[in-house]
Amino acid sequence: MSKFNRIHLVVLDSVGIGAAPDADKFFNAGVADTDSDTLGHISETAGLSVPNMAKIGLGNISRPIPLKTIPTEDNPTGYVTKLEEVSLGKDTMTGHWEIMGLNITEPFDTFWNGFPEEILTKIEEFSGRKIIREANKPYSGTAVIDDFGPRQMETGELIVYTSADPVLQIAAHEDIIPVEELYKICEYARSITLERPALLGRIIARPYVGEPGNFTRTANRHDYAVSPFQDTVLNKLADAGVPTYAVGKINDIFNGSGITNDMGHNKSNSHGIDTLIKTLQLPEFTKGFSFTNLVDFDANFGHRRDPEGYRDCLHEFDNRLPEIIANMKEDDLLLITADHGNDPTYAGTDHTREYIPLLAYSASFTGNGLIPQGHFADISATVAENFGVDTAMIGESFLGHLK
């Protein structure tokens, strides 16, 4: 019998809690990640008030220097710890795959200086369209169409760009490059990015419409991902008949593998929280696992090195945390964590190699305190033990520590 009938895992994308022991092997603009500390530096430089997460015990997590504006709780309502990554990457897919029990020994490739000519030339030859070279770099998806959409409307060239994650994105105006043509080009791009020197997690078709100065991306986005190389705990759950619900980009990250119910993409963190709450309220969701990703922290504020915006985004989540809890049942378990860091005060614009926080809350708890410090995959091992399925490659359950 399950200790908790439902477990809800919420990933606050990029909300790290201090440099990992191997941060010296990861870099931002030539600077090692050794001094990165997403939550610590936001607290220090922008001020951070998250009373609801603090109540669970966020300020009690062991750190060399306590979080400046987040107090410790003498009698927290939950259990907390921090977790270390073992995989050789600090991107979204690597973090999420490890959380679900995999050890990624060959990281995906990211392209901070844009894709090599070899890749661009192949796409040009296949599509019969030129690629706008100036867009070939990490770019905001809305900014890139604002900057190059007018040119695409004139020339029919492709807008190919990337991000901090191992993705290749192609934006195309639906009146200039029909959606079906864009999809075929993306399918081809997927076929040539399955191994080094360009091992990519996702190819994303990004159609848009409108006129210069007023472009909008449409719902015809399509992701061409790769499935995890081995079964994750999501697969173990699904195979055992335990329902799994994906909110936000979780379905894309796992290429649908092990997901029995995709609740759709998020338009924003707030929309994602709305979707999570609707998921919690589903009458048929009496037992199972929900997995939510809230990406605004990372996409809107981490990469843009905006500590004040990041702070406000954390405030927004914390303000809505009581709503999430109010829609949980007595025997539900809530786990709040991250997938990597992205210190908005740090050098460069890339993710940072950090520990991730873990907050555990249930109305059924009679105890509180610290969970032993472990690794990302301990989350999936705990979920697996709770529902009576096998773990994946790695992970040690902390279920027995939750009283």
Swiss-Prot record:
GO BP annotations, alphabetical order: 2-deoxyribose 1-phosphate catabolic process; 5-phosphoribose 1-diphosphate biosynthetic process; metabolic compound salvage; nucleotide metabolic process
MF-aspect GO terms: magnesium ion binding; manganese ion binding; phosphopentomutase activity
Organism field: Streptococcus pyogenes serotype M4 (strain MGAS10750)
Pathway: Carbohydrate degradation; 2-deoxy-D-ribose 1-phosphate degradation; D-glyceraldehyde 3-phosphate and acetaldehyde from 2-deoxy-alpha-D-ribose 1-phosphate: step 1/2
PANTHER family: PHOSPHOPENTOMUTASE (PTHR21110:SF0)
Enzyme class (EC, first level): isomerase
Name of protein: Phosphopentomutase
Lineage: Bacteria, Bacillati, Bacillota, Bacilli, Lactobacillales
Extent of the signal sequence: none
Binding of Mn(2+) 1, residues: 13, 339-340
Location in or out of the cell: Cytoplasm
Described purpose of this protein according to its UniProt entry: Isomerase that catalyzes the conversion of deoxy-ribose 1-phosphate (dRib-1-P) and ribose 1-phosphate (Rib-1-P) to deoxy-ribose 5-phosphate (dRib-5-P) and ribose 5-phosphate (Rib-5-P), respectively.
Catalytic activity: 2-deoxy-alpha-D-ribose 1-phosphate = 2-deoxy-D-ribose 5-phosphate; alpha-D-ribose 1-phosphate = D-ribose 5-phosphate
EC annotation from Swiss-Prot or TrEMBL: 5.4.2.7
Residues that bind Mn(2+) 2: 298, 303, 351
GO cellular component, one term: cytosol
Keyword flag Cytoplasm: yes
